[in-house]
């Protein structure tokens, strides 16, 4: 995959749209329910699926997870969600657990849409099964954790049917304040952009313990701190801010140099707890990014600052979204005061500037299924994932890494266990 070929492919699909005649091509009656199957019943998966049920015409009809205890908790939760919305409880035949649960879910004729919220290592495998089965897919980020998986995801994207919608969980783009300032920035409100600063600072997720679990099960239940399962914090969590930078600049970086390590965290896992990355974009635009994920003080701060020849912009998760300079502008809608707005939400349910991000993205996605045009966001998801891998590789190897070097020599990861033991 040469750089120019990648850019051409990514640019064509980054908008996530295939222009088709609506309604007739999509086969859904107005206001009919889209039947959603949740694959991965953890905190984030449950939160997003609940939001789908509450904010769209989607109904949760099926659940799948590796572990039966997770499945049981999710079933109880969604029984209440469905009852509150006047929907039917989930049928016994649509509850799947074990290492083949994803295949059983994909094969079900009772499911239209699969939400993939499993550990990132499995995203490509689960994408492959869902897309091949003709399902619509909402896949959490990242679409892959290494270069080989990124290539696989790009190929899967080419096999998505014209009436099939596939979204990647970059909901920040759908937050109203961020979408509004993005339009200004892309329209030249900052002049020539010279430098960008970004951050993602959060406290650490608690270690998940489970009775009688062995080493492999402990890894899976704490996948967020496992390098092979998550891709490390830069690829799994910090990806939101890096995606915003790629989106606002309309490009991916050409090279990166980075440092980082694991200085504070003591629980199981091999992910780093901090990164400092200097990305260089076309036109010698620099993006300095820093992240931390440790501590128990519930601090959370994330966002971008962009500096141009005629203006500067702040694009935070929490705080004023504004431009200063010749084309001064500020997001005016009041988002209220919430004492929890500066706290990290492990399930991604943030307040303030991202308050409407999940519901708005979900509504747009469901509309693409019922009315069209269909989405195909896999190429854009691949480009952002590779950008994060570029920074990760530069940090691990302690040297400058180019985009071409990443594609030729990027790390690959193996799971190091068999899931058949959980059958």
What does each model-identified segment do?
Residues 40, 161-167, 172-269, 279, ...:
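Predominantly a Rossmann-like dinucleotide-binding segment in NAD(P)-dependent oxidoreductases
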């Amino acid at each position: 995959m040469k750089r120019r070929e990648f850019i051409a492919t990514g640019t064509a699909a980054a908008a996530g749209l295939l222009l088709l005649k609506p309604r007739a091509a999509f086969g859904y009656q107005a206001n009919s329910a889209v039947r959603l199957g949740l694959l991965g019943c953890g905190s984030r998966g449950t939160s997003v699926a609940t939001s789908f049920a509450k904010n769209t015409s989607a109904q949760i009809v099926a659940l799948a997870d590796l572990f039966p205890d997770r499945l049981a908790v999710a079933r109880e939760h969604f029984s209440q969600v469905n009852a509150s919305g006047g929907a039917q409880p989930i049928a016994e035949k649509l509850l799947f657990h074990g290492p083949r649960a994803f295949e059983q879910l994909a094969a079900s004729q009772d499911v239209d849409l699969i939400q993939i919220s499993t550990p990132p290592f499995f995203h490509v495998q689960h994408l492959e099964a869902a897309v091949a089965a003709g399902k619509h897919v909402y896949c959490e980020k990242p679409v892959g954790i290494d270069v080989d998986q990124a290539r696989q995801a790009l190929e899967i994207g080419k096999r998505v049917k014209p009436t099939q919608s596939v979204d990647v969980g970059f909901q920040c783009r759908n937050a109203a304040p961020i979408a509004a300032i993005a339009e200004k920035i892309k329209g030249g409100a900052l002049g020539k952009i010279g430098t960008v600063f970004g951050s993602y600072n959060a406290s650490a997720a608690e270690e998940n313990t489970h009775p009688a679990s062995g080493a492999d099960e402990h890894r899976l239940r704490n996948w967020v701190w496992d390098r092979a399962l998550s891709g490390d914090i830069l690829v799994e969590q910090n990806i939101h801010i890096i995606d915003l930078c790629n989106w606002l600049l309309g490009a991916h970086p050409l090279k990166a140099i980075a440092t980082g390590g694991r200085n504070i965290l003591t629980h199981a896992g091999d992910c780093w707890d901090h990164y400092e990355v200097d990305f260089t974009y076309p036109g010698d635009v620099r993006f300095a990014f820093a992240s931390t994920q440790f501590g128990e003080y519930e601090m959370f701060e994330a966002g971008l600052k962009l500096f141009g020849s005629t203006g500067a912009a702040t694009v935070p998760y929490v705080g004023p979204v504004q431009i200063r300079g010749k084309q001064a502008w500020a997001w005016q809608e009041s988002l209220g005061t919430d004492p929890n707005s500066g706290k990290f939400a492990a399930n991604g349910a943030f307040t303030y500037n991202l308050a409407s991000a999940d519901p708005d993205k979900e509504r747009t996605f469901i509309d693409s299924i019922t009315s069209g045009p269909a989405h195909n966001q896999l190429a854009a998801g691949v480009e952002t994932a590779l950008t994060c891998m570029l920074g990760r590789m530069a940090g691990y190897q302690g040297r400058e890494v180019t985009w071409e070097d990443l594609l030729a020599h990027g790390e690959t990861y193996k799971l190091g266990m068999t899931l058949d033991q959980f059958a």
